[in-house]
Design a protein with these regions (language model features):
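Intracellular loop-helix junctions on the cytosolic face of multi-pass helical membrane proteins
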Residues: 32-61, 187, 215-351, 355, ...
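Central cavity-lining transmembrane alpha-helices of secondary-active solute carriers
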Residues: 109-124, 378-391
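Glycine-rich segments within core transmembrane alpha-helices of 12-TM secondary carriers
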Residues: 193-211, 218, 233, 478-490
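Transmembrane alpha-helices of Major Facilitator/SLC transporters
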Residues: 304-314, 372-398, 412-419
Length: 535
């Protein structure tokens, strides 16, 4: 039934579940109706949030549910990530898989890339099939089973099964949790940036604790015990999300904003089948040519990860569902996306290049106490937790006078470059064979986390502001595709990080970031013009 450009949810007491009537349209709103006396239908519209809802540190109560969901999901992910590179390259006699370090670093990067690439799938299924809340829950279940797979001592097969499950699960969960955070705020609500900053704070609470606990279990006792603890963390997150979601999240998030028409499902199945068959044919061709190995497979995934955002930007810019104003917003977002991709390429090397530096070129004995290399992964969230209150207060105090999102991005890029300039110094002074003070790693992370707070929460926030109505969750996926593309690049460039070349490597990465920051400074005004008043 078509009417008034709204999707309508009709709640009928006599039926076990609500039915959805598609009532067309550009607005993609969900309005709640309820059946009452005499069969009269009355409006019961409940917005995602109101400006009066300030029960969670001045923020909407629903933010607490999403805060703790992401906290536990990040606990599981970063706990696993803190020990995974060591699990891959430690010898079999030490409980590892025996990969060489270069391969382990490359796999770590492409793994992270695929985790965020799958967010495209999560955004699509949320928008068209399940709605945000269901998609997040299904993703959490897959993540939990992915960690369970790693907890079983079944060698490389368990690793690859785990990678597949966590890649799919994270893709379903991450973009939709962030999209729901954006939905908690009305347009023009100045709490949005501070709300996302608090949300990122929650992410980093889980990320801070995980390397200590999972890293301690994994490196001191048994890798599989560490992975088991990561699985328990995701289970706790699912329980909290299930309970809190019923109480504090709007029913709107249970339903897709742009549901599939009956004929669309067939098209989806056909296109998915074609894509899968094409991928298999490429693998078969590589096998026939004798080039199907782990290195070339990683290269293939790198190409896919870089091509995907290009395809999606093309769709957004040419879709008839996108208005002229929204199209300008997408062009503005493209500039921010490229800057974010470069930033994440640097920041995400913490789990690969800096993890290797921590294990091989850092003096990890301080006052007689041995620091497990995995513990350095807590530096990222530690500094985020230290800095976040100051950034939140600063943005709140400045209010509408705060710098624009492009200006924050430009400043962040310069800080990111500076963080790698710091890493040049110890190698240049003491040589690549020396074990240097841990303070060099501490200093580098301290600087890049300033960059992260200028880019990550702001990027999450501006994505929800610039997203076209018809592609809200899929646009949210684009933010994670920036991370995916950055890590895909890493999967290739980390191979340049070799003994004796560390200083050149750090210097080259720093120069790229600083030049990108300078270019971003020059583009602040043009991007602001395209954003048309959105900060």
């Amino acid at each position: 039934m078509q009417y008034n450009n709204y999707y309508v949810l009709l709640e009928v007491y006599e039926t076990p579940a609500p039915s959805v009537l598609t009532m067309g349209g550009a607005e993609n709103k969900i309005i709640h109706f309820q059946k009452c006396n005499g069969g009269i239908i009355v409006l019961n519209n409940k917005p995602e949030a109101t400006s009066e809802d300030r029960t969670f540190f001045g923020q909407p109560r629903g933010l607490s549910t999403l805060f703790f969901t992401e906290m536990w999901e990040r606990f599981s992910y970063y706990g696993m990530r803190a020990i995974l590179i060591y699990y891959m390259y430690y010898s079999v006699t030490k409980g590892g898989l025996g990969f060489d370090q270069g391969t382990a670093a490359s796999v770590m990067s492409i793994y992270g890339s695929m985790v965020y690439l799958s967010s495209v799938l999560g955004g699509y299924l949320s928008d068209r099939v399940w709605g945000s809340r269901r998609t997040v829950f299904i993703g959490g279940v897959l993540i939990m089973f992915g960690h369970i797979a790693l907890s079983v001592p079944a060698g490389k097969m368990a690793l690859f099964v785990s990678i597949l499950l966590i890649v799919l699960g994270t893709g379903l969960l991450k973009p939709n949790v962030s999209e729901m955070v954006g939905g908690l705020y009305n347009e023009g609500d100045t709490r949005r940036d501070s709300g996302f900053t608090i949300f990122v704070f929650g992410i980093n609470v889980g990320s801070l604790v995980a390397p200590y606990l999972v890293g301690w279990l994994g490196l001191s006792y048994n890798f599989h015990l560490g992975f088991s603890l990561a699985a328990i963390g995701m289970f706790l997150g699912l329980v909290q999300y299930w309970i809190g979601g019923k109480k504090y999240l709007s029913k709107d998030s249970l339903y897709p904003t742009d549901p599939l028409e009956p004929g669309d499902m067939k098209k989806l199945v056909v296109r998915s089948t074609i894509g899968l068959v094409a991928f298999i044919l490429v693998l078969l061709l590589m096998a026939l040519l004798g080039s199907l190995n782990l290195t070339n497979f990683v290269l293939l995934l790198t190409i896919i990860a870089l091509a995907t955002p290009v395809i999606y930007f093309t769709i957004f810019l040419t879709s008839k569902k996108v208005t002229a104003t929204e199209r300008k917003h997408v062009w503005a977002y493209l500039g921010l996306f490229i800057a974010a991709m470069i930033f994440w390429a640097i920041e995400e090397q913490g789990s690969s290049v800096l993890a290797l530096f921590a294990a091989n070129q850092t003096n990890n004995v301080v006052l007689g106490f041995h620091i497990p290399p995995a513990w350095y992964q807590s530096l990222n969230p530690l500094f985020i937790l230290i800095y976040t209150p100051f950034f939140a207060m600063m943005w709140n105090r400045w209010g509408k006078k705060q710098p624009s999102s492009p200006a924050k991005f430009a400043t962040g890029m310069l800080f990111a470059g500076a963080s790698y300039l710091i890493m040049v110094i110890p190698v240049a002074l003491f040589g690549s064979s020396a074990k240097v003070s841990p303070l060099w790693l501490v200093g580098s992370w301290a600087v890049i986390e300033i960059a992260e707070l200028l880019i990550s929460p702001i990027g999450l926030s501006v994505t929800t502001k610039l997203a076209p109505k018809a592609f809200q969750s899929q646009m949210m996926s684009m933010w994670f595709l920036a991370d995916s593309a950055g890590q895909a690049v890493n999967a290739q460039i980390v191979k340049l990080y070799t003994p004796g070349n560390e200083a050149n490597y750090f210097l080259g990465v720093a120069i790229v970031a600083i030049v990108a920051g300078i270019i971003m400074v020059a583009l602040v005004k043009p991007i602001k013009n395209l954003m048309a008043g959105i900060k």
